[in-house]
Amino acid sequence: MIDWITSQGHDIFGMYWTPLWILIRAVLIVVPVLLCVAYLILWERKLIGWMHVRIGPNRVGPLGLLQPIADVLKLLLKEVMFPSQINRGMYLVAPLMVLMPAVAVWAVIPFQAEVVMADINAGLLYVMAISSVGVYGVILAGWASNSKYAFIGAMRAAAQMVSYEIAMGFALVTVLMVSGSLNLSHIVNAQNTGYFANMGLNLLSWNWLPLLPMFGVYFISGVAETNRHPFDVVEGESEIVAGHMIEYSGMTFALFFLAEYINMIIISTMTSLMFLGGWAPPFSSALTNAIPGFFWLVIKVFLLLSVFIWIRASFPRYRYDQIMRLGWKIFIPLTVAWLIIVAIWIKSPWNIWH
């Protein structure tokens, strides 16, 4: 289908087709991601409401389904305030520095077999590199706002993200070791081969089972990387109000929230691709194999996003020193130890991967 569209496009548009096709694919990715963010916020409010024995948003549209549109209109119509002592240029650049890396990551994320904007061999490395840039926007926002609260939040963000990126990096290195590739599609395909996969038990063939500690470390570190509860000391409401976002309003404020929720979806998607078999069904049969792979990936991402929300509703915020201790004294030693175990496992006669 894609090959047919490409050939027809070349025939109709000639030399202009290549940039036009890139633009079309970008729009086809970005627009659904933005819609997912809008309704992820609604799902979060609904789910937390049910956990609190409340109904949640139900006034705008049937069952509250138009609430995200009302929220967007409210933020669009709000005035963007500029405090007098800010560095105006840096102040405006900071939200874009947080948002753009979150959007750029989607260029290499496959949605099912051969459905990816750029199927590059260094896809995993690209995701790790691009996703680490967003913290500079947070630091810039804290500095440019010329506010003590904002600056404290920015410094917390810098320390927290550096701490947990190391553990996340080691977790992804083990995935690289067992799959033998940096290509995200190849990593997914590598999980769906072997003894259990041949029996139709794909669920037991995925990386979550042999790499269980890394699976837990990666997902929990992802919660910390996105500054979500209980790791949200960067914007701890009871301490520093909104942290690095305290001097922002209107759409500039909304861009930070947009980036946060896009990053939540990215972490859930990457966890699904790295550890949960990506677009593969949990059990292989004529019925499950007939269902498009994109459907299975969406289900896995949705369940992981619901875990994000469940964690927010269930756990109190950690102290800053507890967050640092978890990252440096527990996660990093654990990932290094499991990295060594996996390396020995791969070289042993009991190697289950190659």
From Swiss-Prot:
**Domain of life (superkingdom):** Bacteria
The reply to whether 4Fe-4S figures as a keyword in the UniProt entry is: no
Looking at the keywords, is Translocase present? yes
GO biological process annotation, one example: aerobic respiration
In its UniProt entry, what is this protein called? Answer: NADH-quinone oxidoreductase subunit H
A GO CC annotation recorded here is: plasma membrane
Q: What class of enzyme is it?
A: translocase
Enumerate the UniProt keywords alphabetically: Cell inner membrane, Cell membrane, Membrane, NAD, Quinone, Translocase, Transmembrane, Transmembrane helix, Ubiquinone
Quaternary structure, from the entry? NDH-1 is composed of 14 different subunits. Subunits NuoA, H, J, K, L, M, N constitute the membrane sector of the complex.
Q: How does it sit in the membrane?
A: Multi-pass membrane protein
NCBIfam families, per the entry: PRK06076.1-2, PRK06076.1-3, PRK06076.1-6
UniProt cross-references to PANTHER family, sorted A to Z: NADH DEHYDROGENASE SUBUNIT 1 (PTHR11432), NADH-UBIQUINONE OXIDOREDUCTASE CHAIN 1 (PTHR11432:SF3)
The protein's predominant localisation is membrane
The taxonomic lineage of its organism, from the top, reads: Bacteria, Pseudomonadati, Pseudomonadota, Betaproteobacteria, Burkholderiales
Q: List the EC numbers from the record.
A: 7.1.1.-
Q: Where in the cell is it found?
A: Cell inner membrane
Q: Give the family from UniProt.
A: Belongs to the complex I subunit 1 family.
Under the heading HAMAP family, the entry gives: NDH1_NuoH
Q: Which residue windows are coiled coil?
A: none
